[in-house]
């Protein structure tokens, strides 16, 4: 282990005071005075009118909401000085209790000291009296979870490339004496080059050798057996177990341990028996046996895992070794010169970098060192197109600026990055070589239009707040009780089966864990008031295409705790081999199976306690409080992930998988039926005529299934889509010429689903395709309605 980096520790059960981002006790945050620097003249090439009306936070122009939780929201934004895209997590501090604030600030402190190419970077922290803005790296490829759902299991070569990056990043955390404690497929993001980015350090903490931790953190399917037993732990060993579950999931497309309820899941984890698919190599199986070891003392360390044979196949000359953090580069004269032309003084640049202030100065320096955004025309923002900064008279309501940033880190390129490249790289609709200059006066973080939409949906759908999962890497907020809203499970893209997203909770330490886990009573979790963690957290860094926050989609209600009934399981007939038995041939598991009906192995609907991440402290505090956690969530093994364990296979998956392409989830607007949005009215046709025949669908680069493509005219395809939506009683709104925002189901029965349908053009082909993108709702409900619509479309 390397020299230990000083990190202020936070007692996980100390709730009397909360510590601010800089580590000082802060009963009341005093806003700082705005800078006295004079405004810089506008750049010649500047965007005016519409774009100047977009809301700003600091130097960031907010664009779309890509994640949403109870107490946080994640927005895609663009840094106006450099043009780089970032994810901004917006946390309402007034909704958090002292414990949650402590965890939030601890997360920020931890992220400031992490600088690894496979960990989401934190660029800037902007703090006001009521709100905390975390400006983070934007991972445009979405979550590994959604990638697996859409594409199925990875080949071992690809899984190895991803797993090497994951192990490198986690080992780096451990050598800095930081344990993540919430490693799962939902918290693993992909950047534009398909490299891993670990997100969501909301449950991370510092550990000290010899001092045990006792908080149960993590999603049950990924949780180590000692956590189910309520035992104290050192820290790294629980991450190692989670890595074993992740490796199994990457290679097989399903979870090694799952159950109909928490009791069954606990029993399976404590037995330590899991199925080995026939297609898994012996080397991979042997590696799993080093990771998924019941006795934490005998569990392999990550330094040992790095030397494993499977880890280094094809990399014999470059065996995986602990990551050595490069010396910070604070003397890049090219970047400094560019910043000087923007209006920054050299002294303030040096001061911000040397003292690691994580303010706008440091963020600008870091962002200049990152890959510039590319536009459809092939042009990118160059130094000649960068603009000078202008300081508006009022900025962020007397905000206190403190922002961390990460140095430019060389990307570790995935060995197989081209093999499964699917992310939608279509950039925002901004002309190439544009300079941003004038920053409009700070607007409200959320547009009035969005607020009106939220109110409208709440009115029409049983007073529920539509929550969309963010892709942020920011941390999950272990949140205080939300008194009012009830959020629908956040959005996640599922192309098939019911591989369910795991949410994050906190269970109190040993006493509460005894009730919740040792006795294996699932009701102890579903009935207990568990604080729902901001789902926006994980999505912070996640790509717009994937637009999901890595955290829970939560249904928080005020009132009595909710009892969740978990569906039963039917084991698939596909052949398998237990960890100790020989392999047996079976039908190819690569075939994804999806049916228009509910899948046969839906274990936990999304958001179920069993799929959620637990954090020990909250069960005890919240037993008398209304249930804030997400509703049930299906397991990875179920549905698409269960394809490795299920012999049945239909062709429907081919229709669905290709439709779930990562794309920025557009911020929802009116979901109710209106004459202007229904095909029964003649307005869509009139709109088509008015816009002219020259309008074309946007072109996306990804693989389409032939069953989702058509040579039909895009306008005719849109009419067919509206016709099928009407036939299935779906509400929708035409947000753009070829983009529909759709809603189906009943929020009171947890069946509400929101998604986008878009007609897109295939590059270099005279074909168009239909893109499905889930915004919110359970995987099963979304699969059912998406499959039904796909089958009924006559394209």
UniProtKB/Swiss-Prot annotation:
- An example Gene Ontology cellular component term from the record? glutamatergic synapse
According to the record, mutating residue 233 to C results in: In a gastric adenocarcinoma sample; somatic mutation
Superkingdom in the source lineage: Eukaryota
Cofactor annotation: Mg(2+)
Q: List the residue ranges forming a coiled coil, or say none.
A: none
Its placement in the membrane is given as: Peripheral membrane protein
Query: What regulation of activity is recorded for this protein?
Result: Inhibited by phosphorylation at Ser-219. Activated by phosphorylation on Thr-215.
Where does the UBA domain start and stop, copy by copy? 325-370
InterPro entries reported for this sequence: KA1/Ssp2_C (IPR028375), KA1_dom (IPR001772), Kinase-like_dom_sf (IPR011009), MARK1-4_cat (IPR049508), Prot_kinase_dom (IPR000719), Protein_kinase_ATP_BS (IPR017441), Ser/Thr_kinase_AS (IPR008271), UBA (IPR015940)
Cite the post-translational modification comment.
Answer: Phosphorylation at Thr-613 by PRKCZ/aPKC in polarized epithelial cells inhibits the kinase activity. Phosphorylated at Thr-215 by STK11/LKB1 in complex with STE20-related adapter-alpha (STRADA) pseudo kinase and CAB39. Phosphorylation at Thr-215 by TAOK1 activates the kinase activity, leading to phosphorylation and detachment of MAPT/TAU from microtubules. Phosphorylation at Ser-219 by GSK3-beta (GSK3B) inhibits the kinase activity.
Per the record, the major location class is: membrane
Q: What is known of its domains?
A: The UBA domain does not seem to bind ubiquitin and ubiquitin-like and might play a role in regulating the enzyme conformation and localization. Activation of the kinase activity following phosphorylation at Thr-208 is accompanied by a conformational change that alters the orientation of the UBA domain with respect to the catalytic domain.
What family classification does the UniProt entry report for this protein?
Belongs to the protein kinase superfamily. CAMK Ser/Thr protein kinase family. SNF1 subfamily.
Q: Quote additional remarks.
A: Phosphorylation of MAPT/tau by MARK1 could play a role in early steps of Alzheimer disease. Pathological aggregation of MAPT/tau to neurofibrillary tangles, filamentous structures consisting of paired helical filaments (PHFs), is one of the hallmarks of Alzheimer disease. Hyperphosphorylation by MARK1 could be the initial step for this abnormal aggregation of tau in Alzheimer disease and animal models of tauopathy.
Q: What is this protein called?
A: Serine/threonine-protein kinase MARK1
Organism for this UniProt entry: Homo sapiens
